[in-house]
Each structure stands twice: as C-alpha cells, then as structure tokens.
Amino acid sequence: MLDNGFPLATESNILKELIKPPTILRTVVNTITGSTNVGDQLPTGQLSVVPWRRTGVKYTNNEAYFDVIEEIDAIIDKSGSTITAEIQGVIDACVKLTGMPDLTLSFMNPRLLDDVSFHPCVRFKRWESERILSFIPPDGNFRLLSYHVSAQNLVAIPVYVKHNISFRDSSSLGRFEITVGPKQTMGKTIEGVTVTSQMPKGVLNMSLTPSQGTHTFDPVTKMLSWDVGKINPQKLPSLKGTMSLQAGASKPDENPTINLQFKIQQLAISGLKVNRLDMYGEKYKPF
Amino acid sequence: MSAAPAYSEDKGGSAGPGEPEYGHDPASGGIFSSDYKRHDDLKEMLDTNKDSLKLEAMKRIVAMIARGKNASDLFPAVVKNVACKNIEVKKLVYVYLVRYAEEQQDLALLSISTFQRGLKDPNQLIRASALRVLSSIRVPIIVPIMMLAIKEAASDMSPYVRKTAAHAIPKLYSLDSDQKDQLIEVIEKLLADKTTLVAGSVVMAFEEVCPERIDLIHKNYRKLCNLLIDVEEWGQVVIISMLTRYARTQFLSPTQNESLLEENAEKAFYGSEEDEAKGAGSEETAAAAAPSRKPYVMDPDHRLLLRNTKPLLQSRSAAVVMAVAQLYFHLAPKAEVGVIAKALVRLLRSHSEVQYVVLQNVATMSIKRRGMFEPYLKSFYIRSTDPTQIKILKLEVLTNLANETNIPTVLREFQTYIRSMDKDFVAATIQAIGRCATNIGRVRDTCLNGLVQLLSNRDELVVAESVVVIKKLLQMQPAQHGEIIKHLAKLTDNIQVPMARASILWLIGEYCEHVPRIAPDVLRKMAKSFTAEEDIVKLQVINLAAKLYLTNSKQTKLLTQYVLSLAKYDQNYDIRDRARFTRQLIVPSEQGGALSRHAKKLFLAPKPAPVLESSFKDRDHFQLGSLSHLLNAKATGYQELPDWPEEAPDPSVRNVEVPEWTKCSNREKRKEKEKPFYSDSEGESGPTESADSDPESESESDSKSSSESGSGESSSESDNEDQDEDEEKGRGSESEQSEEDGKRKTKKKVPERKGEASSSDEGSDSSSSSSESEMTSESEEEQLEPASWSRKTPPSSKSAPATKEISLLDLEDFTPPSVQPVSPPAIVSTSLAADLEGLTLTDSTLVPSLLSPVSGVGRQELLHRVAGEGLAVDYTFSRQPFSGDPHMVSVHIHFSNSSDTPIKGLHVGTPKLPAGISIQEFPEIESLAPGESATAVMGINFCDSTQAANFQLCTQTRQFYVSIQPPVGELMAPVFMSENEFKKEQGKLMGMNEITEKLMLPDTCRSDHIVVQKVTATANLGRVPCGTSDEYRFAGRTLTGGSLVLLTLDARPAGAAQLTVNSEKMVIGTMLVKDVIQALTQ
C-alpha cells in the first residue's frame, strides 16, 4: 500500500487484514452472503509495535513448523572438479500459535552460519551475543532467516554427471550420452532430478533414449530437458542417443552447459542442526 | 480473484435479465462504451439506498478509471456518497475523489466537510485516512484547510496520525510550494518525535520539502541514529541516505589522514569497533598524546552512525542493505568498509533485478576498494543461467578484481566464457581479457597469445573483437609483435566484420615499417575491393595508402593514386573529403608544400597507447545506490553528495539539552576517569549528594537512618554532628538545584570540600564518602559511578565512629589488607556494556540510569560497648563483591575500643552455623589501642536465606556470641540488563514466581530519585532502564543461587502504586516485597 508513492504498509499481515486472502471456504461464504474479501474491520495492525504480527490470533491447535531448506549452488567444470560451490539456506517457518508467543530457536552449530539476514522480528542483539534466534513470530508463513555457509567449508556435491558429447567434423551426426549418479548422499535418495542443457545452434534434432524418465528437445530453442525423477543407485539413469547436425556446417565450437537440479529430503547439506525451540510469554503448551 | 464469480452472479440478479451486459466483468470492456445511458444507470445505482448497489456502481466506476476512461461526469453523483456509512463504498469514493477532484474543484469542495468531520473522529485510523485523502485532493482552495489539518495532526496523540501528517506534507508542498515555511515548522516538530513510526515518514517529508535545511537534523541526529534499527524498512532507507548526506557535511573525512592513522591510532581505535566508548576513550588519549600532530579523530557521532547502521546489513530488505553499504562506502574509514562486502555478495543471490543494481554498485566500489571484494572473487563467477546484463556486469567486477595473484584463475575462467553461446558475452569477455592484459603486465604476453589463438575461431564476432583488442594491446609495444601483425594481415581475406578489418588496416599502416613486404600487398588487395567496403574500412584504406605513400612511395605511388581517385567519387562525402585532404597533404603540388613537408610527422606521429578503462571508473561521484549512479547521468531530484568539509562544524549543535544520551555521558565519563584528581578524591568529594546525609557519618546508634533517606538528619544524635549535618544539608540542596550541570559544579566544589576535609572535620568527610548521593538518577552521576565505586572501599572502611578524632592518614594504616578495592576494570566493563546496551534501546525517552548499588545499609550493632566491656562492634553490608568468594556477602566489621586497655587478639571463634552457611573470617586484629577503631571485612555465604550467622567474636580474654542477620535486600547483587532482557526474563518468571502488592506512595516519595533511592537502599539491585516514566525496574541476582530477582514498581498518578517482584526464590521475593513496601511507605 502506498501513500503518495511512499510505501505505507508492505507487511503481509497488515495487507491480509485489509483484504483477506481467498480460501475455498471464504469464496463459498461470500457467494452465499454476498460479502467480499475486503476486511470490514479497521486495520489496527499498523498501529502495533510489532507490525508483523496480528493481534488477537487464536488457534485451537497451536503448532509451529520450521523448514530448513538449503541450496547448493555449484559450478563444475567438464572434468568434474568443482570451480565454486556455496551453500545458501533459509529457514521458513509456519507458526500458528495463539496470542503473543516469544520463541527462541537455538542451533547446535551456529558457527556454521557465515552470513545471515533476518526477518525484522528477530532480535539482533541476542544473535550477536548468544547466537540464539529470539523473536515474536509473525502469524502464518514467513521466512525467518536466510543464511550463507562460508565458502571455506568444502561442499560435497551429492551427485555427479558423466557426459560424453561429441560432434564430428565430417559427419552430420553427433554422439550424446549422459549418466547421472549419486555421490555422498548419506543414505538419502536423490529425488526430483531434472537435467537441462542448451544445445548449440548447429544441432537440428536429437534422437535419444532415456533409461528412465522422460525427455524433450525443442528444436527451436535447442533446449534439451530430461526429467529423471529418483536416482536408483543400483541402476543409474542415463540418456543416450545421437544428434543430427546441420549438414555441411562445421562442428559447433561451443560447449553445451548441463544444468542439473535435484532434491534431497531430510538432509541439510551444511550439517546445520537445530538444537531446541522454546516458547515464552504464553501459558499453553504448543507441542 | 475469487471475488469475480460471486460478483458476476450478484449482478445478474440485481440488473435483471433485460440487461445482460451487466453480467460482464467491469474490466472486460464493451460495457463502457461512451454511451451516456450507461452512466445514467450508474447514477441511478449510486442514488439508491442499497449499499450493495452503490458498491457495485463504485466498483465499475473505479474500474473505468483504471482503464483510462473518463468518468468525470459522474462526479456529483459520486461525491454525494462520501458520507456513506459503508466503509467499502467510502474507500472507493475516496479513490474516485483523489482522481477527479482537481478537475471539478467546486464540486469537490462539497466533500471537504466530511473529511473535516473525519479529522475529529475518535478513532485514530479514521482520522489518519481522512487526512490522507484530504491531502490527496489537489484543490488549491483547500490549501489552508490542509495546512490546518496537518498542523493539528502533527500534534495528535496517535503516532499513526502523526505519521500520516508527515506523509501529507510533501503532497501539500507539491500543490502549493508557497507553504514551505509553515511546512518546515511542522517538519521540525515532527522530527523531534520519538516514535519509530513517525521517524521514517518525516525524514521522507524532509527530503522532499527542505533537504537543504540540514540544521533541522542536528538536534535529532542522535535520536535518529538510535531509533534507526526499529524503524520500518522503507523508512530506514530514507533515513540512511539522509544521514549519509548529513554526515558528509558535518564530519571530517575519515580517510584524510590515512598515513598518520596507520602508525598512530589504527590499533587504538579501529580495534575497538564494537566498543564505542573504548574507542572514544582512546581517541582522547591519542589526542592528548600527540596534540601537535593532530591525528584524525573520529567524531563520536560519526562513530555512532556507523555502529548503529551496521546491524542493518543483516536486514532482509535488499534496499536497506544497499543503503547501509553506500553509507559505509561514503563514510567509513578504509579499514571498516570491508564489512559490507559480505552483505552485498549475499544480495547477489536475489532476483536478477536486484543483482543488476547491486552489481553496478559493486563494480564502482571494486574500482576504489579492490581488496574488499577479493575474498569473494568466486561469488562473481558467471553462471550459465545468468542473463546477459548480469554476466557483463560480473565480468566487469571480475576484471576489476583481477590482480597479480589471482589472474591465473581469472583467466582460466575467462577461457571458459569464450566458449559460451552468448556472443555478446563472449565479446565482453575478450575485452575483459584485454583490460586484464593492460592492467597486469605479467600476463600481457599470455593474453596476447590467447587472443591470437582466438583469431582462428570460426565465429566472426569473436575474431573481430579479438582483433580490436589485439590492436589496442599491440599499440603498447609494437616492435616485438611483427609476427602477430603479419598474421593479422593474412586474416583480411577472411574477416568480414568492418571494425575488425579497419583495425587490421590501421595496425598495418601504423607499423608498416615492421612489415615492409606485406603492407603494399594488403593495400593492393584492399584497392581491389575498395568499392565494396564499408565506410569505416574505406577511411582506413585511405589512411593506409597515405602512410605507405609516405614510407614506401616507390612501390605504392600508383596504388595510392588509384585509391584516392576511387575515393574522390565515393558516395560518402566524408570519404571524398578525406581523400581530397589526404591528396593535398601527401602529393606535393606546385604551390603548397609547407604542409606536405611535414606530412610524415602528421601521419606517422607516435601515438599514445589507449588506456583500457572500466566504464565505472568515474561513476563514484554519484552517490552509490542512487538512480543517477545506475544511469550514470544526473536524474531529476538527485541530491549531490557533498564533499567532506575541511574543518569539522561545531559538533555541539547535536547536543540535546536533556542529558539522556548515554553516549555523551560515556564520553564525559572517560574524561573524568582520566583526571587523576577525580579518581583521588572522588569518594570524598561527591558534590551531588542529595538531601540524604550519609548514615556512616553519624554515630553508631544512628544505624536505622540508612533505610529512610532524608531522615538521617533528624535522627542523628550528637549535637556537633547536627551542625555538620546542617552544613551538609545546605550544600546538598544547593547541589540539587544544580543537578543539571552537576559536572561543572563538581569541579568547582571539590576544592572547598578538600579544605573542609583537611580541617579534620571528619564527620563531613566520611559523610561525603556516601555514594547514596549518586542515586539522583542523573546520567551525569552515573558517569561518576565506576570511578567512585572503585574507590569506595577505602573511604568506607576508613569511616570511623564519630566520637573518635582520627585523621584520615592514620586510618589508612588500619585498613586491613583483606580490604581490596574492587578491581576497577571489571566494573567499568560491565557498566560499559550496560551503557552500550542502553544505546541501542528502542525507546529514546529512557534515562539510562543504571545505577549501581549504593553502599549498603547503615550500621547495625553487633556488640554493644557495654556488653562488650568497652569493645563496640558494628557491621555494615558494603555491597561489594567479596574478593574471596563471589557467593559471599561482604560484611564490614567496625571495631572500636572505648575501654582503657588495649584489646588484643580479635578474631572469630568457632562458628556454629546452620547448614549451608559459611563464613570467611577476617584476619586476626592483633591489638586495638584504647580509643582506636579498626575495620575488617568478612564474607558470609548466607545461602540465599535470611537465617542469622552466629559466631563467636574472641579476644584474648573473652568470647562474645554474636549473630549477623542479613536483610533480604543484601542477599543479592545488581545485574545490568536492558529493558528487553528484563521483559523477557520477567516473562519467564510468571505465576508462582510473581508476587504483586499494591501500595500507596506517600507524598514524600513521589519523585523519581527518591523512589529509586529508597528501593536501592533496601535491596542491592541495579536499575533497569525503562521506557515509561512511571515505571521503575530493578534487577539483581541472589548471591549464592544466582537466581534472578526482578522488581517492578508501577507508580500511578495520585500515589497508588503496584510493586511486583519476580523471582524463583519465592521466600526472598515475599520478604523483598515486604521490605520495599515498608521502605517506600514510611
């Protein structure tokens, strides 16, 4: 919400107070009663000292969930050695607690966190002095903090890609083969693997057979994408086939880059561990 | 949106089947043809009594406005509804009004009275939104009304309304800039506001209306710095950029004396970044040490700004991080700028738009402060998924960061980039390699070889770019590279890119003496294809021909003439012109010749090598993070960042009358500490004692007076003491009057006091050792505290019964060795820490009066002189940590011998103690002469209970059974904590652990300092700063168990008050409540 171009309210809790987010139930109710999603109460949240939290929050089930999500971002050269790799993490929370709870979250190994940025609710001084996250949470979903794990720590990339892509000068056919395999996954399965690669302009089409998953090649954008799914360590997924190149043209001298995305559930790659979560300020037991 | 289906159904119902168009979504078009009948419908709907119809109509009208259709003819119908009860309709009417009021000014006036009514609404939200809409209506006639409304709202109770007032200021200013002076008054008033809600908005108004009135900021500077962290994010951005400008005008450049700094003060105060006060201290020492050299001393306010903005680097908002980064870049000393690098690198993980802006700024920063980003080199490596703009900016940064040590890795990275599919990026990479080669001499040959290899690349663009870069590189050292030029000459057959061809031709022409055989041949080829060439190539062909004609006219004379003739008839006049000009110069004609003699000099003059520079080189004259910096052009409304002043303007303009800023007091504290004079006589010369005269100065029996301050005088026994008392009293009141400038008074008064002391009037002397005086909750007193506290021990142990006439010096000898002055550094550091905490506290109204405890309760009798056969013993709780064991309460035992014979061998005999209680005995006093007195310190661990410690006091001849029972208030030690910590701790100690009692405060103790004094006299607690003036908070820990004791006194008007004690030890809590209430209500 802006006033004369200056942001007046950007906190989602206040905005939700003004216009309630649509839910199925509310849509039904609105249809019947003819009311709208526009809040009929004055947005008192703007007046509060903790603008991120609505007042008078009530839940029958008090619960709080915290998700630690970490991303590895790595550049790997064609021989498989890591050029740069960094771990970026966020802690997303879904807090549904009655009243004005005051939470503290502590880590087993807070030293890991090299660079952090907080939701404004986090008390910075507590973090500076004790490395504890102390905060009055906003209601609902929010991003508690995002952090960066120092680049000094070597990052073990949990997957590898074997590739063999070759263009021959004379023929109009090229060979293409990729295999994806797990590496240091600590017993967890690698899921949601997708491989995408931008092929050089000279590639007209590709005829490939995957050992699992589905693949598509867009001859216009020259984008190859392969949806692999889970990796079974016994039977590594691979994608093999040939590329048909523009006849007569010399072989393309660019190297296609391969982008690989994957997910591992229940694993924080940096080894970050949450120690405990305490709640103060409210009398009920949340969990 | 989910509302859509419901809404269309509604409409179907209301409009009836006859008008099916009604069912359309208002935004879908078609129904808003410029048919006036439609508007009649709307008018009808607006005129009905049904809110739902009105709402419907308003929705459609607003949708029309959004689509750019004219809905102004509905104005009268809409304005009527401004008084509608339905909030939703009202809101939409407001939207309409803001859009059309300017066009229909007369009619708009009809709505004004509604807003004026709204401005008086009891609900702050309605007041605020009435003002918001009123100020958005751009009708010049209502300017006076708006002005009035803004002025009124600026002094509204609700900070939210005041915030809205601040928002309204720029709106009014843009409507009528003649109001500036009045508006500045309002801004000035709002700037003084202490709430975080207002701060951001008013600074925004300040920036819009009167950015040049920097003098308005002075008084509020420290407040803004301290509030900054709690302001909402958008406000932070505005405040930070305003403070950057402010600091540039008010402080000296931290980099001006770099060289001096390095050797002198670097360690002294850069090392103490986090500890401001310490820094300030060493500043002063540095200044004192080398006044002649005048090293740069950072203004404490400058430091305050840097320190308070630093945590904001951790903000989730990229704008705030960027704002802090530019602040540090522009204001911080070189050594500290580095902290921003990490945060900026973090922003690179954000959306590409954010990345773009951040990288632009990083590129500028990395030119000036390369070292800052070097550790993060790898973070700027390019990802294949980056958009081209980002890639090019990252390249820029990588090139800026490249140096002797990291160039191999950078070049290897560049090599990979060259094979990218993004051709623009490849071209940029080649240029980057060129820049690396020029900047770092060591790798020039490697780069050149690499570039030459690229010449065989199949991609023309790559080759062309390489040629251009090679040309620039070769210009630096042409002699050694004949081979490369030959190679390039061969390329002319293949390369088609005009720029590259032109570059090659220029190179051959320039260095034709290195390739004497090939050059004419190239010219021959070019002459053949001359007509087909691009203009830029043609020009270079003429150029080449001219140069060859001058150096090798035998072989090329004909060719040159041929080329010139071709050019003479070229379509492009530029080329024709050039040809004519060249011919006149080089071909000697009959009459001319003056010029042609110098033709060689003209054409083949040695040319300076081009400098390959970053395009970000001189962007830093724009304020980083600004739009102007991003565009590299001055945007409208850009405020030039002023240069540092030569001389620092007077820093005292920022002083606020009320000394509520811990920081300034800190500074003064330091000053005081340095003066030996003070530390010597501090204890004896406290000029600030309140009406309360110290119990210790009085005769032994006057022990009760301690708990009731101010009553000491009346209860004093001996007459001569009384006189002293009166004197004291007079002086005390005097110093009370002058509490405000107590410090200056101090200096003046000390001599007087000294004189008195030397006149052996030890009554007044020891009385002044009282630290009770320091409770007058003035921050200035607080400064004295650590110093005086550290010195407190000797005087208090010295203080002897009044009846004995012993001079101070003699007493010194009697001070038992076990009486150790509390180690000053420890105390200083704790109180410092507390001070610093006070600084960052949210509420600025705080008086950070973290009073340290007062030297305990008055004397209690241990052994009466009759019972003790001449030996009188009494004790006091000194409230200092006992040196041997931190869990022990230190008790000062005062012996005085009023018998005729010396008492020998005073010691503690076998104590009979309840479980848990232990005693650290005092060393044996060998002899106490008649009339003499002595003091010893013993430690007692009471185990957090008020049980009495019973023990025997033995002399050589007798044994006395004595017992010491501690008041509950002595079983604890003060703890320093901030308000927030206090609240948090209090939150943990609810329910059973909380004891609340109501009481009536008598008239005598309604003033702040009396309450504080009474509480701290009763219990050894530390004051916790508190936001509201009627609440007093104290905190302590029990000595043995270390459990927290939190005391809150909530004084309401008319004397009613509520006392709350939170403690795990409920017994202690209950007793404490009782004691405090007794003390307060007496």
Curated annotation (Swiss-Prot), chain B:
Superkingdom of origin organism: Eukaryota
Protein location: Cytoplasmic vesicle, Clathrin-coated vesicle membrane; Golgi apparatus
Any one biological process term the GO annotation gives: synaptic vesicle recycling
Compositionally biased region (Acidic residues): 691-700, 716-727, 775-784
Keyword Ribosomal protein found: no
Composition-biased stretches (Basic and acidic residues): 666-677
Keyword annotations of the record: Cytoplasmic vesicle, Epilepsy, Golgi apparatus, Membrane, Phosphoprotein, Protein transport, Transport
Sequence ranges of Low complexity compositional bias: 279-295, 704-715, 757-774
Region (Disordered): 1-30, 272-295, 666-802
CC annotations in GO: AP-3 adaptor complex; axon cytoplasm; clathrin-coated vesicle membrane; early endosome; Golgi apparatus; intracellular vesicle; presynapse
Disease with which this protein is associated in UniProt: Developmental and epileptic encephalopathy 48: A form of epileptic encephalopathy, a heterogeneous group of severe early-onset epilepsies characterized by refractory seizures, neurodevelopmental impairment, and poor prognosis. Development is normal prior to seizure onset, after which cognitive and motor delays become apparent. DEE48 is an autosomal recessive form characterized by onset of seizures in the first year of life. Affected individuals manifest global developmental delay, intellectual disability, absent speech, and poor, if any, motor development.
Self-association state and partner proteins as the record states: AP-3 associates with the BLOC-1 complex. Adaptor protein complex 3 (AP-3) is a heterotetramer composed of two large adaptins (delta-type subunit AP3D1 and beta-type subunit AP3B1 or AP3B2), a medium adaptin (mu-type subunit AP3M1 or AP3M2) and a small adaptin (sigma-type subunit APS1 or AP3S2).
Function: Subunit of non-clathrin- and clathrin-associated adaptor protein complex 3 (AP-3) that plays a role in protein sorting in the late-Golgi/trans-Golgi network (TGN) and/or endosomes. The AP complexes mediate both the recruitment of clathrin to membranes and the recognition of sorting signals within the cytosolic tails of transmembrane cargo molecules. AP-3 appears to be involved in the sorting of a subset of transmembrane proteins targeted to lysosomes and lysosome-related organelles.
Protein name: AP-3 complex subunit beta-2
